[in-house]
């Protein structure tokens, strides 16, 4: 191996070459690996908090009638579950993956702006505390739904202001993280790594970062207008003063639809790394994958009103948004076709990362089909705000984003920790999660088709059976994640397990497998020399 990679063999006089110790290592962290770890820990913590809220929702809906919570608290639970999962669990989780893997995959020494990286993480802590703490404010947490539609938000208690402030902080954190990722990818690639030789995970994050910078200010604008309507006498969304609540929906969903692609594109990137590794083949159609990802990002800006077919829109508008939404299925199908083509006639083995990747493709595609169904305006007018919609977006967000993160964890954790996770337990986690997930959300399609509306604490008797099944599935799914934490994640974090080799996966390619396991504190301090495919370091 070249001198670039001999990290520990020679003496370093410089103080910064040794990892700082104790609490300072984490509080003052500027190393991309430490910050990535912090993001992932924060993300998992919020996943557990959001999960507890979800289980309270499902416990309430286990039977008709009011069991545990009153309707006001129920609406707080649904609102906060959505906000915490989207802004506290999924987004920081993928930023953690980006921090850890992007510099390793492009042969960079670190992220471009190390201190800004630290700042963008530590902003999450007060924001998270404020969101969770809003439950303890007068009047309870925000209860307007995670979309925070006016006019309800104009009548909420003081916790609404805390929620708005927290979202502003999270938005600032996301924008800083995105600037960091863009500058790192565009400026810090090792010589010889052109953009079209970059790993797919870096591509998806580059595109995601541009999306974040484009739409986070739009959310900030919407919630700032809500704030001024609440306290400063404006009437942006207040019909009494000549405002329009529907305008809020337009502004929010212009942010909200690109946002759901922000949450899925990094998962696409992880799947595009895992599938070739366990098929022992190059990714099929690399260029088309890049163009498909870009197409998804561009199209995501012209589909927002499909969330609003029922608010009163000219038929021309409905047709435009219906067709543009159906069009986005084309690049998505290109990606799914390419993953299947990558597996075609490959020497496949099914270790846990591959199981999650195949599970992702299968269940995410089901979510995509229900999305295609909801894209059709006449059908959506029937199904809007029913449990069919809940089923659809949990199929793409849980079986999409969350499974993508699990695949990434199992794939890269040997590089992070230096030890292998327990393969048998990983497989248990996969099957348990997959079955429990489908038991939870599949019946919701039937509930929605039968007309059960979302966001109600009580429901008529005819919906009882499927709700009971869904609640049992939800508790099983939650238990599977507790199992994952205590029996899979904790042991590897504590360094228990078989020692991981430099490249534990036979078919894996890329610069992250050219450094020792666990990854040294400093990597690629001098830019590595790469082979023509830019996936190996040469002497």
Each model region followed by its residue ranges:
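Membrane-embedded and interfacial regions of multi-pass energy-transducing membrane proteins
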Residues: 2-539
């Amino acid at each position: 191996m070249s001198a670039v990679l001999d990290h520990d063999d020679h003496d370093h006089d410089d103080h910064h070459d040794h990892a700082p110790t104790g609490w300072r290592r984490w509080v003052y962290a500027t190393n991309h690996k430490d910050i990535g770890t912090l993001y992932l820990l924060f993300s998992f913590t919020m996943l557990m908090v959001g999960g507890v809220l979800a289980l309270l929702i499902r416990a309430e809906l286990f039977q008709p009638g009011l069991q545990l919570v009153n309707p006001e608290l129920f609406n707080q639970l649904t609102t906060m579950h959505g906000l915490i999962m989207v802004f506290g669990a999924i987004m920081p989780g993928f930023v953690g993956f980006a921090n850890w893997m992007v510099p390793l995959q492009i042969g960079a020494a670190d992220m471009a702006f190390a201190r800004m990286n630290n700042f963008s993480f530590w902003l999450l802590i007060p924001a998270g505390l404020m969101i969770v703490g809003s439950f303890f404010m007068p009047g309870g947490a925000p209860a307007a739904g995670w979309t925070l539609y006016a006019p309800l938000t104009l009548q909420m208690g003081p916790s609404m202001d805390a929620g708005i402030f927290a979202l502003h902080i999270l938005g600032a954190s996301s924008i800083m993280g995105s600037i960091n990722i863009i500058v790192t990818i565009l400026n810090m690639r090792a010589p010889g790594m052109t953009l079209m030789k970059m790993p797919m995970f870096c591509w998806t994050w580059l595109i995601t970062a541009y999306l974040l910078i484009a739409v986070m200010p739009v959310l900030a604008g919407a919630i700032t207008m809500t704030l001024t309507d609440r306290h400063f006498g404006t009437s942006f969304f207040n019909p009494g003063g000549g405002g329009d609540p529907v305008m809020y929906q337009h502004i929010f969903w212009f942010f909200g639809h690109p946002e759901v692609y922000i949450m899925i594109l990094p998962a696409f990137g992880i799947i595009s790394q895992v599938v070739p590794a366990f098929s022992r083949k190059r990714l099929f159609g690399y260029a088309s994958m890049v163009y498909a990802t870009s197409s998804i990002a561009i199209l995501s800006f012209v589909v927002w009103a499909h969330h609003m077919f029922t608010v009163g829109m000219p038929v021309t508008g409905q047709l435009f948004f219906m067709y543009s939404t159906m069009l986005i299925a084309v690049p998505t199908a290109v990606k799914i076709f390419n993953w299947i083509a990558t597996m075609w006639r490959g020497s496949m083995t099914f270790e846990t990362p591959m199981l999650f990747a195949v599970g992702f493709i299968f269940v995410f595609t089901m979510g995509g089909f229900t999305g295609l169904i909801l894209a059709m305006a006449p059908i959506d007018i029937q199904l809007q705000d029913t449990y069919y919609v809940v089923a659809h977006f949990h199929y793409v967000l849980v079986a999409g984003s969350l499974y993508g993160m699990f695949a990434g964890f199992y794939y890269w954790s040997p590089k992070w920790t230096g030890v292998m996770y327990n393969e048998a337990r990983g497989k248990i986690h996969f099957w348990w999660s997959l079955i429990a997930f489908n038991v939870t959300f599949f019946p919701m399609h039937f509930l929605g088709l039968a007309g059960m509306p979302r966001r109600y604490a009580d429901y008529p008797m005819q919906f009882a059976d499927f709700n009971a099944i869904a609640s049992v599935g939800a508790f099983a799914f939650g238990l599977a994640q507790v199992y994952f934490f205590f029996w899979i994640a904790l042991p590897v974090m504590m360094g228990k397990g078989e020692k991981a080799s430099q490249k534990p996966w036979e078919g894996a390619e890329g610069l992250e497998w050219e450094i020792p396991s666990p990854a040294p504190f400093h990597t690629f301090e001098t830019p590595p020399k790469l082979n023509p495919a830019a996936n190996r370091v040469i002497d």
